[in-house]
Amino acid sequence: MGRKNCAVIMLTSACLVLTACAPTEFPEQNGTEHQNQMEGVAKQELTEFDTDDVEKIPDHLTCQVDDLLMVDADVRLWGLSEWKLSDWYATEKNYTESEEEAHELIQKMMNEAGWKYEEKDVECYRNSEGEKIYYVEISNHEDNVYVLPDRFSYSTERGYVSLNQSDFCGDYKGDNRELYKTGRELAFGSIKESEQLAVDYAEKMGIQVSDTVDCYTLDEKNKRISWLDLDKFDNHTPEEEENRNFSYAIFLYQDYFGIPGLRYDPGDGKLTNDTTFRSSVCEVSVDRDGIAYFQSAPTYELEKMGTEQEILRPADIIEKQVEMMKSKEETGEMNLSEVSLEYLPVYDKETELYHMCPVWACYYSQTVTHYGEVNYDSEEKYIAIYDAYTGEVLQTK
């Protein structure tokens, strides 16, 4: 979905007040009359977020609710074409269940990297749970391919450093990752070309991803944070590493009937009946030499469809989320950054199936002050999950 129209909104404790693209001037009047007029505008303009035409829903909301609460949020509907979605039931793909398929996947990744594949080079071991893991170590410089039960990866030294030993690695799970979403294009290729390269690679590996991706430009701001293994990199200096490691970090989201799986950790394994929640984000590094790093995510395969039902509009969820945030805002400034329609995988141990439930995921953050010998603030990231059919709060974290 491309960028559509925007709306600038103000929120009161009672309702949403919106003006489309330009502020509305209100004459000087007493507080009650002014408030009534603002509420009248809200009832009229809120229809933009409650329309039956999905394509007319704005994809970004900006507002200052009060001194402590800000909404500057992307509204992600992904491939939604109507206000109806079906739940469904799935199994998780096991990439190492078949030795032959694991070898084929390794061969694909090595061919794409320009590395020579030989069956004798593929090694295998079992993890603590007895599951097989297949891999090929090309060198001791983080050049390798791995196939695990729930995912697979291809890594080069340069890609590994960019995504796993850099400032971006420390930032990307928090709101600071937006510092790298500058839109700056690097000399070796445009953002659009690099995004397409990442999508094409995923599809060659058998993963269907959404047309919507997130791209972050890693340039001089992306410093290497770990040089403990410097002995592995002969004749390298931090300055040389910085200059040669300009790249794009691209996040891909697996597509299920037009909607991604839940992309980030909800922070509570009980919600999914799983001991650990695995993000559905595929991470890719693209640099001057092409794909430098690719890590897939758990993939769910359809077993049976559930029942199609109408889902709530974004406006309903935004109102609920703002009220929830207002109840917590006295502890620090808060920002709602994203409202996204996603599938939540809930594992049923009896059937051994995942129930893929459509949910509205609201990603938000709060400035938290830590007191001690030296006081400091940190930006804490949270997620609230709502049943897309009923609006029931499944989790606030």
Give the label of every model feature segment.
Residues 2-26:
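Sec-dependent N-terminal signal peptides of Gram-positive bacterial secreted proteins and lipoproteins
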Residues 3-6, 37, 388:
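Short linear motifs in intrinsically disordered/low-complexity regions
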Residues 21-273:
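Preferential activation on post-signal-peptide N-terminal prodomains/segments
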Residues 197-283, 287-371:
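Segments that shape or occlude catalytic/ligand-binding pockets
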